[in-house]
Curated annotation (Swiss-Prot):
Organism domain of life: Eukaryota
Protein name: Calpain small subunit 1
Keywords, comma-separated and alphabetical: Acetylation, Calcium, Cell membrane, Cytoplasm, Membrane, Metal-binding, Phosphoprotein, Repeat
Function summary: Regulatory subunit of the calcium-regulated non-lysosomal thiol-protease which catalyzes limited proteolysis of substrates involved in cytoskeletal remodeling and signal transduction. Essential for embryonic development.
One GO cellular component term noted in the UniProt record for this chain: calpain complex
Domain EF-hand per the UniProt entry, residue ranges: 96-130, 139-172, 169-204, 205-233, 234-268
InterPro entries noted in UniProt: EF-hand-dom_pair, EF_Hand_1_Ca_BS, EF_hand_dom
UniProt subcellular location: Cytoplasm; Cell membrane
Amino acid sequence: MFLVNSFLKGGGGGGGGGGLGGGLGNVLGGLISGAAGGGGGGGGGMGLGGGGGGGGTAMRILGGVISAISEAAAQYNPEPPPPRSHYSNIEANESEEVRQFRKLFVQLAGDDMEVSATELMNILNKVVTRHPDLKTDGFGIDTCRSMVAVMDSDTTGKLGFEEFKYLWNNIKKWQAIYKRFDTDRSGTIGSHELPGAFEAAGFHLNEHLYSMIIRRYADESGNMDFDNFISCLVRLDAMFRAFKSLDKNGTGQIQVNIQEWLQLTMYS
C-alpha cells in the first residue's frame, strides 16, 4: 500500500508460506492471553480536508468522513512501528519474548518469512478458539485480506516479520481493551460501550463516525463481536496513520490525485 510505505517499514520479498506447526496455537494463545490492558476532485488532484464536500449525497458523506478523520487523527498518537532492520543486526538485541515470537513466525511463514491472508486467518481463528469469552463468527478470508492489505508496506500481498509483529502487538492490546469494556460479559461490545473502548485504543471519534462504524461493523442490535472489533481498529489505525503521514504540516487537510486515492481505497 503506497501510503503505508511512509510510516511502516518492514517485511521482505514474497513466495509461499508454511502451515500451523505443532503447538503453535497454544503458544500464540499464551502470548495473546498475556496482553496488558489499556492502552472532490477533477483535474490533477483531489483535496481532502476538514470541511464538507459540495454537491450530492456522496460528496456530503465523503466530506463528513474526512472531517471526522482529520479531527480524530490530530489526537491519535500511537507508538511508531519499528524501523526496517536486517535480521542479523537485530537478533542480538532482541528480548527473549521477541526471540520466541520470531521462532513462531518462522514456523508459520516458512522460508520466505511472509504471512499470507490465509495463514493469518488460520492463526487468528486458532487463537480465538482458546477464548470462549470472546464472541466471534471467526475471522473470514476477506477480513484477513483487508488486514494484510492495510499493513502490507511493500505490496507483496503478504506480511513480513515486522509488519506481522506490529499487527500482532496491536491485536493483543485491543483484545485486552475488548474484554475490559465488555462490562456485561456478553462476549460482545454494545453500542453504548464502544466509545469508551475506542478511546482506550487511542481513537477519539465524533458521533457521526461512531454511527457509521456501528452500521458497518455491528449487528442489527448494535453489538460488535471480536473479529469485527479487530477488523475495524486495524482499518482505523491504518487510515489515521496514512492521513497523518500526508498531513505533514498538521493542517488537517491533505491532497491526493485520483491514482493515489484509488490505491488508498481499493487495496485495503
